[in-house]
Amino acid sequence: MPELVGLRKPYIQVRRTDSDCITYGGDQGFFGGAPVGSEDERKKNMGCGIIALADLFLYLANKSEEYRTEKNRNYVNRILTQEEYKKYYNVIYQFLGGIKAGAKGGLSCIRLQRSFNRMAHRNHWELRAKWGLRSKGLYDRIEEMLGKDIPVI
């Protein structure tokens, strides 16, 4: 029987304002209903990479004090309200430099990788993000990350 591999800690949880349901991870839909052309509309339409990175930082911080920073310290190890998550998202959004008006897409994977590595270097984490386009070894890399209790994005 194959070995099951997955995260060992509970994933990020956010209580939705409109339904009181709990999501696993953030949702760029939290910015729904924003005026056309607004920054919040850009977050809704192109913020999936930022959500992924924000969730990764928060998961690591939930996992170990070593990964807590001034950016995530107030949001660890609890169910966040939707408004709290949006505040946290905005902190990460500013760290990443935001999404410029008129952008045709969200943040590139390379930019997310560099931002993660910058944060890891500043905080002396022994982690490094890598971006790879080849599918060779993909499942082995995913299994390795999950084996180290690191979400795959």
Where are these regions (language model features)?
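Active-site-adjacent structural segments surrounding the nucleophilic cysteine of cysteine proteases
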Residues: 1-109
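Conserved active-site-adjacent core of cysteine acyl-enzyme catalytic domains
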Residues: 82-153
